[in-house]
Curated annotation (Swiss-Prot):
Topology with respect to the bilayer: Multi-pass membrane protein
Presence of keyword Membrane: yes
The protein's name in its UniProt record: Uncharacterized protein RP722
Localization: Cell membrane
């Protein structure tokens, strides 16, 4: 049952994200990491080596998906700025005064245009990172306790 549930979760997430966002690799790594974490927690005891390695693979997979998504968003953001030619014209001003640059961003409505993307990705990335850090500390502490 767990195997079929994991398979359906992976299949539906890949299909849905490919249809809507065309970025299946990021979501595949994210879901795969969560699947490894679920398998490690439900199938193995916390003192086994398989548990340790599955948790590490899961956490690395989730973190790598966050890095891939951050790089993708940065490149997308940079390309849009290049088209607007706002970054080059205001790069000298940005060093001198941040307030003038913020006024320019609001006047060209660039910040408002990217606000939904920032709101969509930043909280989920931070929450995923916090959960992964908590899980890693918890199982690493248990693993170190049982190996002594």
């Amino acid at each position: 049952m767990l195997k079929s549930l994991i398979y359906e979760l992976l299949k539906s997430s890949i299909k849905q994200e490919e249809h809507y966002y065309s970025k299946t690799f990021f979501y595949f790594l994210n879901i795969l990491g969560l699947v490894f974490i679920i398998i490690a927690n439900y199938c193995y005891s916390s003192d086994s080596m398989k548990f340790y390695f599955l948790m590490q693979i899961g956490i690395i997979s989730v973190i790598s998906s966050m890095v891939i998504e951050a790089v993708r968003c940065y490149l997308k953001y940079k390309n849009r700025y290049r088209h607007l030619d706002c970054l080059r014209s205001n790069s000298g001003v940005l060093v001198g005064s941040i307030s003038k640059t913020l006024i320019d961003l609001f006047s060209t409505k660039t910040l408002i245009r990217y606000l939904p993307t920032i709101i969509r990705y930043v909280p989920s990335t931070v929450i995923t990172f916090i959960i992964c850090t908590y899980i890693k500390r918890k199982f690493l502490k248990n693993f170190m306790y049982y190996t002594r």
